[in-house]
Amino acid sequence: MTPRLGTPVAPLWLCLALTLPCAPVFCADAGPLVISVPQGFDGPIESEENGGMTIAWVKRRPASDGGTSLQISAIDVGPSLDAIAPSERIQAASHYLMEFLKGLGQQLGHFEFGEFTQATLAGLPAARVRWTGAVAGHATIGIMYCVLIGHSVVSLQTQDIGSEVTPQMYSALGAIEGVRVR
């Protein structure tokens, strides 16, 4: 229960609320999804082309050009997804995840990925994979998901420089795993 402002408890409640730690998070629409963007991720950076959209945020590292990215891409493929039975949606998500990986692999050197695993995003079956590669000679790591929502194929990803998942990536993964359908 929240105290009403006219009660003697209200000033005490307000003082207490102001002393609690707060991690500013904001919600953003990303195609058919809503995501709670973690604290410190700047953006969005948006682009639209060929019936698809991409939106991304970056948590920059001090004294560095790089940072951790959080990216969502959605492609409207029309009613073709309507014919996919619920029991086949994880297979379809895995198929499209492989297509997204092929595109990513063309941009990276030494590209490798692990086994696909099943996940649930916004209550829907999703495919997930961890990958590694190199950008300009620097090791890069990422985790990518794919989920089918309505008429959209949606890819969600976080990546960073290095060979291990970073704390910033874990923050982005929490946001990805907490998405909601709009």
Residue positions per predicted region:
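Surface-exposed amphipathic alpha-helical segments
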Residues: 38-43, 153-182
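A short, solvent-exposed beta-edge/loop patch
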Residues: 143-153
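N-terminal secretory signal peptides that target proteins for export/translocation
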Residues: 1-7
